[in-house]
Amino acid sequence: MADKGLLLVLSGPSGVGKGTVKSAIVEHKVFPFEYSVSMTTRKPREGEVNGKDYYFVTREEFKQAIADNQLLEYNEYVGNLYGTPLGPVKEMLAAGKDVLLEIDVNGARTVRQQMPEGVFIFLTPPDLHTLRDRLEHRGTESEDVIRGRIAQARKEILVMQDYDYAVVNDTVANAVNHIKAIVDAEHVSVRRVIDDYRKMVKED
């Protein structure tokens, strides 16, 4: 049977480790997929590469992309704009490839509205103390920003009910293993393969 590409949306509070988990999936080739690189107006963090981690653009360039309907979703978070280029996502899914989006909660909500067939995974910290430790360990945000992110995380965790799966990022290895299990299960989900079998039984 022809296997359709999955749109896998990985989301969760800032500092929960979405980027780290995504990088581990990429590095260890846990399952074959195409990663959709997001666009942002924020400045690169140490070690981040333009075109690999994000497309780093100016606010003017970002607004032009919005005007040209080139983004699947976009929003502003802590003074910076973030968005997902639409064209590459559509092309990869049409080619039957699995696509991974790593986006924030607001972005995931918009994608859910436009592509409800996606698989939505909420990555959550073991607790808020761990989340604070991770944000402090970054060394890139002030105490005021960290407090703001924690307050936002309290609200975002409550929208977990809108997702298909919840994965606790206690360790990166555990989180990656859970995500792989989700992908494997989704590929054999009846709702994803039933149309192929309906076609099969109608054939002569």
Curated annotation (Swiss-Prot):
Task: Supply the name of the protein.
Answer: Guanylate kinase
Q: What is its main location?
A: cytoplasm
Function as written in the Swiss-Prot or TrEMBL entry = Essential for recycling GMP and indirectly, cGMP.
Underlying gene: gmk
Species of provenance: Lactobacillus delbrueckii subsp. bulgaricus (strain ATCC 11842 / DSM 20081 / BCRC 10696 / JCM 1002 / NBRC 13953 / NCIMB 11778 / NCTC 12712 / WDCM 00102 / Lb 14)
Query: Could you say which EC number(s) this protein's record lists?
Result: 2.7.4.8
Listed A to Z, the keywords are:
ATP-binding, Cytoplasm, Kinase, Nucleotide-binding, Transferase
- The segment(s) forming the Guanylate kinase-like domain are 5-184
Record-linked Pfam families: Guanylate_kin
Q: Which GO terms describe its molecular function?
A: ATP binding; guanylate kinase activity
Q: Which reaction(s) does the protein catalyse, per the Swiss-Prot or TrEMBL entry?
A: GMP + ATP = GDP + ADP
In which compartments does the protein localize? Cytoplasm
